[in-house]
Regions:
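Substrate-binding/catalytic subdomain of NAD(P)-dependent oxidoreductase enzymes
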Residues: 1-74, 79-81
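Catalytic, metal-anchored helix/loop core of enzyme active sites in primary metabolism
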Residues: 49-51, 57-120
């Protein structure tokens, strides 16, 4: 929730806090349910979203059932993927493979700053 709020503030001028992020844990998915999903070619991943709406910015972190061959599902373990859906460049993304604490927060912010500087 904290990372979602920070990114929304930086990229979308959301002026929000982690408390405003809708949250749902992944704990409701039992091992049996995960096996059923795998047999059907699906997986469950914890996905963070920031979406602009007519009423402002909607922020959420919740489990989503994804196709195993999809881009979001391809990220394994503690790795993370950031996708930005832009007006002019379409969808751009960055992935961090097995990041540590420093890489997760600072690295992501630094990379985004570089991207914004490049496209400005």
């Amino acid at each position: 929730a904290a990372k979602t709020a920070v990114l929304a503030n930086v990229l979308l001028d959301a002026r929000t806090t982690p408390k405003s992020v809708e949250r749902e844990g992944i704990g409701a998915f039992t091992e049996e349910r995960v096996r059923e999903l795998a047999a059907a070619g699906q997986t469950v991943c914890l996905v963070s979203r920031a979406e602009t709406t007519a009423n402002g910015v909607r922020l959420s972190v919740r489990p989503e059932i994804l196709d195993q061959t999809g881009l979001l599902a391809s990220v394994q373990g503690t790795s993370n993927l950031l996708l930005l859906h832009t007006d002019l460049m379409g969808t751009v993304g960055t992935v961090s493979i097995a990041p540590g604490v420093d890489q997760t927060a600072y690295g992501l912010f630094s990379d985004l700053a570089d991207i914004l500087e490049t496209i400005s």
